[in-house]
């Protein structure tokens, strides 16, 4: 399981065991979905960004180009919620606007973006929530092309072969922040953290990432898992 820490000015990759159970997976899944599903809110004050050096600006352009170049991706992930709940699983991404999370412990939980909406489904509880993709932090990662032109960089850390970048939206900075962590030389996307309006953080760390493969479009099609049960009660 991979997490990112900071020590003595460097960004380090930390490896530590985690205890995973069904309750933790559901808790983490709910927290992660809440972060991705959080709609943006109107800002009370303009955001304040850090002063970027020419090297920082060049690195931002490099990161934007790198992310935009990722057309498809498969990876294992570890997700940690604000309450400490931990879950693992696998994800698929296709640009623009499509992503699918499946959790190891509970196949009943699904998080899906289909270019238009982000869906959170819990089959055991027979619950589904959805919100427009472009109104969520997920859109910052899934849009095409990826750009920083409408974002404010509130933190930029450079370590030994690593970059950590925190951004908020210029128009709605109170909606939360997105922090991205990359290995460098060469660039590699390692982790993101979403902090929602309630200042609760959900972190997703990637491992065994693969890029550029053909993905079945059906992975990103929402299919109502409750349709059959509803039909049983229709007159």
Language-model segments: residues:
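C-terminal segment of N-terminal export signals and the immediately downstream linker at the start
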Residues: 19, 37-58
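Gly/Pro-enriched, hydrophobic low-complexity segments
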Residues: 149-152, 156-235
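An acidic-aromatic
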Residues: 45-46, 90-140, 202-203
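N-terminal secretory signal peptides
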Residues: 1-20, 24, 28-38
